[in-house]
Amino acid sequence: MRIPKENLTHGFIAEILDLFQVNSMTSDNNLVLVRGNYHSTIHLNKDEDFIEFISTLEVKDFGKIYLSFLEFIMKSHNRDFDIDFDDYPNKNGCNDLTFLFKYDLRNKSHIEDIEILNLHNLFESLLYKANHMCREIVLIKRENLINHKEEKLIKDINKLERIYRK
């Protein structure tokens, strides 16, 4: 179904996603809340003419080098996928990674209902990849930490051996 861009609303986006069995609803502040594999929101910005998909993930000890790597990987999948890192830790010591995907409506007079579903599915697949990469980064960090501890343990054992051999 072709929907004129000027008739597109948050409520209409939620209804379209519901028709395709995507659990969504509108909130009081004109966002569409989506509860699928990942919790996300959809924001229709009529002033700047885009649809924005947003989701947040909490990370701990996620340095700038990891963020740079994640951004590089995700941009290679889709150049419209952005990541925002909140420098200020939450109460639990974690930082927020916000994943953003903007779809430009400026050159469109209509949008198809299936296109909205496809955009949602694309965002979910990008979230899956980003989440997977974050898990990989955490596993690599833990493995490096364990290896470092093992190296230190081996050095300490070697020192003890030398002491006892004297």
Where are the language model's segments positioned?
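Short, highly charged C-terminal tails/helix-capping segments
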Residues: 136-166
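Short acidic/polar mixed-charge low-complexity motifs
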Residues: 36-40, 49, 79
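A short acidic-to-branched-hydrophobic micro-motif
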Residues: 42-59
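Well-ordered alpha/beta subsegment
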Residues: 90-124, 128, 132-145
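Generic recognition of long tandem-repeat/solenoid scaffolds
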Residues: 28-35, 53, 97-101
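Short, ordered beta-strand-loop transition motifs
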Residues: 23-28, 45-47, 87-96
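Short, internal acidic amphipathic alpha-helical interface segments
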Residues: 55-104
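Charge-rich, low-complexity N-terminal segments
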Residues: 1-44
